[in-house]
UniProtKB/Swiss-Prot annotation:
Record note on quaternary structure: Acetyl-CoA carboxylase is a heterohexamer composed of biotin carboxyl carrier protein (AccB), biotin carboxylase (AccC) and two subunits each of ACCase subunit alpha (AccA) and ACCase subunit beta (AccD).
Ribonucleoprotein listed as a keyword: no
CoA carboxyltransferase N-terminal domain segment(s): 23-282
The protein's role, per its UniProt record: Component of the acetyl coenzyme A carboxylase (ACC) complex. Biotin carboxylase (BC) catalyzes the carboxylation of biotin on its carrier protein (BCCP) and then the CO(2) group is transferred by the transcarboxylase to acetyl-CoA to form malonyl-CoA.
A Pfam family that the UniProt record links to this protein: Carboxyl_trans
Organism this protein belongs to: Lysinibacillus sphaericus (strain C3-41)
Protein's UniProt name: Acetyl-coenzyme A carboxylase carboxyl transferase subunit beta 1
Any one cellular-component term (Gene Ontology): acetyl-CoA carboxylase complex
InterPro entries recorded: AcCoA_carboxyl_beta (IPR034733), Acetyl_CoA_COase_Trfase_b_su (IPR000438), ClpP/crotonase-like_dom_sf (IPR029045), COA_CT_N (IPR011762), Znf-ACC (IPR041010)
Gene name of the record: accD1
GO molecular function: acetyl-CoA carboxylase activity; ATP binding; carboxyl- or carbamoyltransferase activity; zinc ion binding
Pathway(s) the chain acts in: Lipid metabolism; malonyl-CoA biosynthesis; malonyl-CoA from acetyl-CoA: step 1/1
């Protein structure tokens, strides 16, 4: 018998007691044990090492958008199984139950420090934030709504890339979203892309990288192919910080890297600086 088991308390049924599930969270970076409640108060940033934990779409709305102002859009859109991929429908159903989302992106209209915006927030907890036809359609409709309202669009990306279960239909979303953003740009309207960990594949190669202002959170991994694939293809070792947001900033691929505690205020300031009407067509 292990010595530590002698000191474990038992409940009335003789079962060993432990911490209530969800009470504590271990930081994957520094291994520090945090009270989950304190972690959430700190916007899911480790108080010991500043590691930025992944956030759900709902958590980002609560943190980023003015309280009570967010109205979601297009939640009725449902994913089908165009290629009859085995178990795909079941996996989508499980993801819906686990996340409370209809798909891997939450879109809607709200205000940021009083300024009206349209926002799209990807959630990597839903099938790794992969982009299928519904994700692409929701982002496209969000951009079109921003054009209609003549307001900025802000997109938070967190994705493993295009969704393989939808084949070419998922790849088509790269073009569709980019074209919608081109129309938004032609109207003289602001698009801020905020890349969070991870942003990869078809998402990084399309709408995530074409913002008027491209921002990332600290230590976010951003790229097309993964590090291991690139190293095996090139047969050479890559820098330790390769594909991290700070590396991309140093090499001109990003405009800024903001700590999560500063992100809301910095983006609100950028929106106020750039929001006065856009191009007026006669």
């Amino acid at each position: 018998m292990a010595i530590r088991s002698l000191f474990r308390k038992k409940n009335e049924d003789g079962q060993e007691k432990g911490f209530p599930e969800g009470l504590m969270t271990k930081c994957p970076e520094c291994r520090h044990i945090l009270l989950t409640k304190e972690l959430e108060k700190n916007h899911k940033v480790c108080t010991k090492c500043d590691h930025h934990f992944k956030m759900t779409a709902q958590e980002r709305v609560a943190y980023f958008i003015d309280e009570g102002s967010f109205v979601s859009m297009d939640d009725h859109l449902q994913t089908s199984n165009p290629l009859n991929f085995p178990d795909y429908v079941e996996k989508i159903s499980v993801a819906k139950q686990q996340t409370g989302l209809s798909e891997a992106v939450l879109t809607g209209v709200g205000t940021l420090d009083g300024e009206e915006i349209v926002v799209a927030i990807m959630d990597s907890h839903f099938r790794m934030g992969s982009m299928g036809s519904v994700v692409g359609e929701k982002i496209t409709r969000a951009v079109e709504k921003a054009i209609e309202l003549r307001v900025p669009v802000i997109i938070f990306t967190a994705s493993g890339g295009a969704r393989m279960q939808e084949g070419i239909l998922s790849l088509m979303q790269m073009v569709k979203t980019s074209v919608a953003l081109k129309r938004h740009s032609e109207e003289g309207l602001l698009f801020i892309s905020i890349m969070t960990h991870p942003t990869y594949g078809g998402v990084s190669a399309s709408f995530a990288s074409v913002g008027d202002i491209n921002i990332a959170e600290p230590q976010a991994l951003i790229g097309f192919a993964g590090r291991r694939v690139i190293e095996e293809t090139l047969r050479e070792k890559l820098p330790n910080d390769f594909q991290k947001s700070e590396f991309l900033l140093a090499h001109g691929q990003l405009d800024a890297v903001f700590h999560r505690k500063d992100l809301r205020n910095q983006v609100a300031m950028l929106v106020k600086m750039h929001t006065k009407g856009g191009v007026q067509h006669v």
